[in-house]
Design a protein with these regions (language model features):
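Generic hydrophobic secondary-structure signal
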Residues: 11, 15-18, 30, 137, ...
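Lipid-handling modules and contact-site tethers
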Residues: 114-170
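Short, low-complexity, charged/polar segments at coil/turn and helix-coil boundaries
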Residues: 13-127, 164-170
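Disorder-to-helix initiation segments
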Residues: 1-20, 130
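Residues at structural and domain junctions
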Residues: 1, 12, 23, 62, ...
C-alpha cells in the first residue's frame, strides 16, 4: 500500500500557492479515485453488532464504544490532505481511514495476536499482512489490486507535468 513518491508534499504546496485551480482539480480527481474503494469498504462493515454486548443500549453509561452500523459505515472516509510526518519522516499524501472508534476496532481486532482465536463470531475476512491487515478497508484495497494506487500516482504525476508546463510558460 505505501509507495515512495518524492516531492509530493512540495508539489501540493506549490500547486496551492501558484496554481490553486490545478490544486482543486487534483484534489477532486483524487477523491474520485478513492471514493469507489471507500464505498466498497463500507459494504464490508457488518449490519448488526458482531459481538454480544457491543450493541447500542439506550441508557448505557459505558465508556467502551458501542457498535452502531450506520456510524461505523459513515466513519470510513478518505483524506486528501497530507498527514504529519511520522518519526521516520514518512507522510501520506492521501489516505483512507475509519474515524469511528467501533469501526476502527472491528477493522483491526485480532491483529496483535493472529495465532490466537480472538473471536470467531466477529467474522469478516482479514486481508493484508501485519500492520496493513484489516476486515473492511484493507480488504477493499486488496481486492482493488493496486489499480487505485497506480491511478493516484498517475494523477499526481499529471498534476506535476501540468504545473511545470504552466511554470515554463511564465
Amino acid at each position: 500500500m505505501p509507495t515512495n513518491l518524492k516531492g509530493g508534499v512540495k508539489l501540493r504546496k506549490a500547486l496551492r500557492e501558484f496554481s490553486p485551480d490545478l490544486a482543486k482539480e487534483t484534489i477532486k480527481e483524487l477523491g474520485g479515485l478513492l471514493r469507489p474503494v471507500t464505498n466498497k469498504a463500507r459494504g464490508y462493515m457488518p449490519a448488526e453488532s458482531p459481538l454480544s454486548g457491543w450493541a447500542v443500549r439506550p441508557e448505557s453509561k459505558a465508556k467502551f464504544p458501542m457498535y452502531d452500523p450506520n456510524i461505523a459505515k459513515r466513519g470510513i472516509r478518505y483524506k486528501s490532505s497530507p498527514s504529519r510526518a511520522n518519526r521516520r519522516g514518512w507522510r501520506a499524501l492521501v489516505s483512507i481511514l475509519n474515524t469511528s472508534a467501533a469501526g476502527a476496532i472491528y477493522e483491526t481486532a485480532g491483529r496483535k495476536n493472529p495465532g490466537g482465536n480472538f473471536s470467531p463470531r466477529l467474522g469478516g475476512e482479514r486481508k493484508g499482512q501485519g500492520k496493513l491487515e484489516g476486515r473492511s478497508i484493507f480488504r477493499a484495497w486488496n481486492e482493488d489490486q493496486g489499480k487505485t494506487q497506480g491511478a493516484v500516482i498517475r494523477a499526481i504525476q499529471t498534476a506535476s507535468v501540468k504545473f511545470n508546463n504552466r511554470k515554463a510558460k511564465v
